[in-house]
């Protein structure tokens, strides 16, 4: 028996006036998800705990059965591992954004117009960076999907106890990175990052990719903004923890990195962006091929577009993307036999918030021996009446392993 945990990143939301006080999921036409709800057991889930606002990283760790309060060291190492950068003990890794700044250093677009092409060429220039005051520190950049990138600092005397440079909203300069403790290492690392942000603008503002973007009235990716400092985490292999053969199918470096640290096989895909313009047909075909033809028996799958729309405040686009996932992906996945599917989100990304929130997310479990409840619709409101009631992310793997007959009895 095989199992799938399919996470629609950021799908949860709050009622919107433009949808007659419905969420984008409620407003969406999702006949396939509704059919799954009718044929499955439903409920709502707090990825970590009620009211706790999870990151995508901490939410996925919890969903995979890890305690994020114990294993989470920061976002950076997971992002780095996800794009193929080997992070070694002593390294400090960061998630970065390619962003747009004006001549006064004001950030005018935190995601550089959701840039899709040219970041590899920009990174080639950034990887020649040497800071005059810190020539012994190796600076490693690597592009990820879209506007995302990673930074790894390698050298002696570094610390992950530093703040983020991300201003969170446009119209401000990058935040000054400050040490979060009084150590020499934290002060040194903060100084390196502040100098690096300034240097990045100097190095790439006139890059040919950016000059072309300006000519095309597109925001240039002319500054790097790091956040999510972290050192190498210690994560028990998922295959050892649950005695499964697992794989991760994801679009973004963050989720692939979590999968790598968890020892999962990473199934890479072409032509996926992590946005609403991603190639859902490729994602669908990859899932079906792996489930039918590989020897993996457990899959973590992440589809990211709804989260992007939530962050950008695009209500219609979020609704439409959910509908497209239903039409393209779920219409075929629901036909899989001898497979348990756990469909959920990692967190809510409400249009009104433009960020994550602590609202619980909807859950469906379908499969051969699921106890079917009387819920017939997949939405945040409808599934709250379901047979699973309200669970936490930490419950997901226990439930799935039990259904798949991989669980062990507790007690005599």
From Swiss-Prot:
| A Pfam short name | Metalloenzyme
**HAMAP family documented for this protein:** ApgM_A
Organism this protein belongs to: Methanobrevibacter smithii (strain ATCC 35061 / DSM 861 / OCM 144 / PS)
Q: Which NCBIfam families match?
A: apgM, PRK04024.1
InterPro entries assigned to the protein according to its UniProt record, in alphabetical order: Alkaline_phosphatase_core_sf, ApgAM_prokaryotes, Metalloenzyme, Pglycerate_mutase_ApgM
**Member of which family?**
Belongs to the BPG-independent phosphoglycerate mutase family. A-PGAM subfamily.
* EC numbers: 5.4.2.12
The EC category is isomerase
What is this protein called in UniProt?
2,3-bisphosphoglycerate-independent phosphoglycerate mutase
Q: Which reaction does it catalyse?
A: (2R)-2-phosphoglycerate = (2R)-3-phosphoglycerate
- What pathway, per the record? Carbohydrate degradation; glycolysis; pyruvate from D-glyceraldehyde 3-phosphate: step 3/5
The question of whether Nucleotide-binding is a record keyword is answered with no
Q: Which UniProt keywords apply?
A: Glycolysis, Isomerase
According to the UniProt entry, its GO molecular function terms are: metal ion binding; phosphoglycerate mutase activity
Q: What cystine linkages occur within this chain?
A: none
Q: What does this protein do?
A: Catalyzes the interconversion of 2-phosphoglycerate and 3-phosphoglycerate.
Annotated GO biological processes are: glycolytic process
């Amino acid at each position: 028996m095989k199992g799938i945990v399919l996470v629609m990143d950021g799908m949860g939301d709050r009622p919107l006036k433009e949808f007659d006080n419905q969420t984008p999921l409620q407003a969406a036409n999702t006949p396939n998800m509704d059919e799954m709800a009718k044929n499955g057991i439903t409920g709502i889930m707090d990825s970590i705990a009620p009211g706790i606002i999870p990151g995508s990283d901490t939410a996925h760790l919890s969903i995979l059965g890890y305690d994020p309060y114990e294993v989470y060291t920061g976002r950076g190492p997971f992002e780095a591992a996800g794009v193929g950068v080997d992070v070694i003990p002593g390294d400090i890794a960061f998630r970065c954004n390619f962003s747009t700044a004006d001549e006064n250093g004001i950030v005018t677009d935190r995601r550089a117009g959701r840039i899709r092409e040219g970041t590899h060429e920009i990174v080639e220039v950034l990887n020649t960076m040497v800071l005059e005051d810190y020539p012994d520190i190796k600076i490693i950049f690597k592009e990820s999907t879209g506007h995302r990138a990673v930074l790894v600092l390698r050298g002696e005397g570094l610390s992950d106890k530093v703040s983020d440079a991300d201003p969170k909203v446009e119209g401000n300069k990058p935040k000054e990175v400050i040490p979060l403790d009084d150590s020499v290492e934290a002060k040194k690392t903060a100084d390196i990052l502040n100098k690096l942000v300034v240097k990045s603008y100097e190095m790439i503002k006139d890059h040919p990719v950016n000059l072309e973007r300006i000519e095309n009235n597109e925001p240039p990716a002319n500054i790097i903004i790091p956040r999510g400092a972290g050192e190498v985490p210690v994560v028990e292999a998922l295959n050892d923890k649950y005695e499964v053969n697992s794989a991760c199918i994801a679009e973004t470096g963050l989720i692939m990195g979590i999968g790598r640290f968890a020892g999962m096989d990473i199934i890479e895909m072409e032509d996926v962006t992590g946005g609403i313009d991603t190639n859902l047909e490729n994602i669908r075909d990859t899932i079906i091929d792996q489930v039918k033809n590989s020897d993996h028996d457990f899959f973590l799958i992440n589809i990211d577009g709804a989260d992007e729309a939530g962050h950008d405040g695009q209500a219609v686009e979020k609704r439409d993307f959910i509908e497209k996932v239903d039409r393209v992906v779920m219409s075929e996945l629901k036909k899989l036999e001898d497979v348990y599917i756990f469909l959920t989100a990692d967190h809510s990304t409400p249009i009104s918030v433009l960020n994550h929130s602590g609202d619980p997310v909807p859950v469906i479990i379908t499969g051969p021996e699921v106890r079917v409840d009387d819920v017939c619709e997949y939405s945040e409101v409808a599934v709250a009446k379901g047979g699973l009631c309200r669970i936490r992310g930490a419950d997901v793997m226990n439930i799935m392993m039990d259904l798949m007959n991989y669980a062990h009895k507790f007690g005599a």
